[in-house]
């Protein structure tokens, strides 16, 4: 953990090596209950974004509170597709080594750009991702953020529906109930998801985020038990009931040099996304100096790196090239330990689904600029049913979670992590040429290239 934290602190603090701290106004980011006026940057106000810890203010959340909540925001069911990302380029155990390095590198870049958003919000005196974009880049392009928010949330709902479809059919099978994947999906959607998504107040669902991180940690423990216990190796207790026999070959660490490793990169772009919440975490942090904010980021993304590295390694080392897009599908339905993981994941995804769906629905309304006074219950209900039906139909047709994760990451994941934060930061620099502005240009360019190539590779096998 200490090594991961130090790596991320270096990534975050490299921004402090290029120039001196520029003081900014006290309480540039206010408590979430206080609206800060959105003002266009004047020509003399746009400059270097504050890097230091001169400011104090913010909310009441301590660093440990923020770290725990940010870890919950980052780590989700998407980690269950990462072993398939390794299998996309390698089939030998040594492929895990470059995969772990890639996980760490993507974590560091994601942490850095998460911090950039906080810095831009502080400089532009804004409290949200979209407001920061409007002030730094311009309102004329605000539809880009609205569309990206909608698509990002919708891809999340699509992935969750696919996870529930696979998880429920396996859970039903484990208790002797025969049902198809589509039947399971329609059942859980109509009986559980639709009523939850129609709820007007989602506050009661907040505790499910805790279930999510506990479920992921339990799943990691269960995967470790099965790998080190050899239950799915040759002659293993549960091998006969596995989705497919483990498959290993000779494509190891060197295979990471192939373009197919970008599929894992794109999945990781999606896996680390919590960037829309960066302004909220900065605003709610007690004594919210940038140095304290960086500590929150370093510990949180460091923990996410360790969890992702462990679960990716355990899944791939157990099943190799046979790793499914949802790694839980590989395990036998007769394996009680993994059935408990499926239950934990199903509860977590079910509780989180309407929270994410609210972002999808609001994103559509924002994209089409529907006035608040027109957002009545009738429109709310019709839109909910329509969007949920479309999502369910797509989830019924699509069966490869890894494909959805890689395409979503290649398109909007790379944009949200690599491109948008760096563009906002560069706009506040007004043409300055420093090490950091050059670094941001490189990161943005990498996002474009990786997104284009990653999308092509992910789709070519369809």
Predicted feature locations:
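N-terminal chloroplast transit peptides
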Residues: 1-29
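The first (N-terminal) embedded transmembrane alpha-helix
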Residues: 63-81, 190, 269-274, 311, ...
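Short, hydrophobic transmembrane alpha-helix segments
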Residues: 82-97, 202-203, 403, 460
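Membrane-interfacial loop- and helix-cap regions that link adjacent transmembrane helices
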Residues: 43-59, 64, 115, 120-146, ...
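Central hydrophobic cores of alpha-helical transmembrane segments in multi-pass inner-membrane proteins
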Residues: 77, 107-116, 189-198, 420-421
């Amino acid at each position: 953990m200490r090594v991961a934290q130090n790596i991320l602190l270096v990534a975050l603090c490299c921004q402090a090596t290029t120039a001196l701290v520029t003081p900014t106004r006290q309480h540039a980011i206010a408590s979430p209950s206080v609206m800060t006026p959105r003002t266009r940057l004047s020509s003399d106000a746009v400059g270097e974004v504050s890097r230091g810890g001169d400011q104090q203010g913010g909310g009441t959340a301590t660093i440990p509170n923020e770290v725990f909540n940010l870890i919950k925001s980052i780590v989700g069911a998407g980690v269950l597709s990462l072993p398939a990302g390794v299998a996309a380029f390698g089939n030998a155990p040594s492929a895990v080594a470059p995969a772990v390095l890639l996980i760490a590198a993507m974590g560091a870049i994601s942490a850095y750009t998460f911090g950039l958003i906080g810095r831009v919000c502080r400089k532009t005196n804004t409290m949200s991702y979209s407001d920061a974009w409007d002030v730094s880049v311009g309102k004329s392009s605000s539809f880009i953020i609205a569309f990206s928010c909608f698509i990002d949330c919708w891809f999340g709902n699509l992935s969750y529906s696919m996870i529930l479809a696979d998880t429920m059919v396996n859970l039903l099978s484990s208790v002797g109930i025969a049902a198809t994947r589509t039947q399971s999906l329609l059942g859980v959607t109509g009986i559980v998801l639709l009523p939850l998504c129609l709820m007007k107040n989602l506050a009661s669902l907040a505790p499910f985020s805790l279930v999510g991180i506990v479920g992921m940690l339990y799943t990691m423990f269960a995967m470790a038990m099965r790998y080190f216990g050899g239950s799915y190796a040759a002659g293993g207790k549960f091998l006969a009931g596995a989705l497919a026999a483990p498959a290993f070959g000779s494509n190891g660490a060197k295979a990471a040099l192939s373009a197919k490793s970008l599929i894992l990169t794109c999945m990781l772009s999606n896996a680390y996304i919590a960037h829309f919440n960066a302004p909220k975490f900065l605003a709610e942090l007690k004594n919210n100096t940038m140095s304290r904010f960086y500590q929150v980021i370093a510990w949180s993304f460091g923990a996410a790196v360790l969890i992702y590295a462990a679960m990716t390694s355990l899944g791939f080392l157990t099943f190799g090239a046979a790793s499914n897009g949802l790694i839980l599908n590989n395990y036998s339905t007769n394996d009680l330990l993994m059935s408990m993981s499926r239950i934990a994941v199903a509860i977590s995804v079910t509780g989180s689904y309407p929270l994410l769906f609210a972002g999808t629905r609001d994103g559509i309304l924002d994209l089409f600029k529907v006035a608040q006074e027109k957002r009545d219950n009738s429109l709310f209900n019709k839109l909910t049913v329509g969007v949920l039906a479309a999502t369910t139909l797509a989830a019924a047709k699509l069966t490869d979670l890894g494909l959805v994760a890689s395409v979503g990451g290649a398109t909007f994941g790379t944009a949200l992590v690599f491109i948008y934060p760096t563009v906002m930061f560069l706009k506040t620099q007004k043409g300055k040429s420093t090490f950091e502005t050059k670094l941001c240009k490189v990161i943005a360019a990498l996002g474009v290239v990786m997104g284009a190539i990653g999308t092509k590779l992910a789709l070519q096998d369809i």
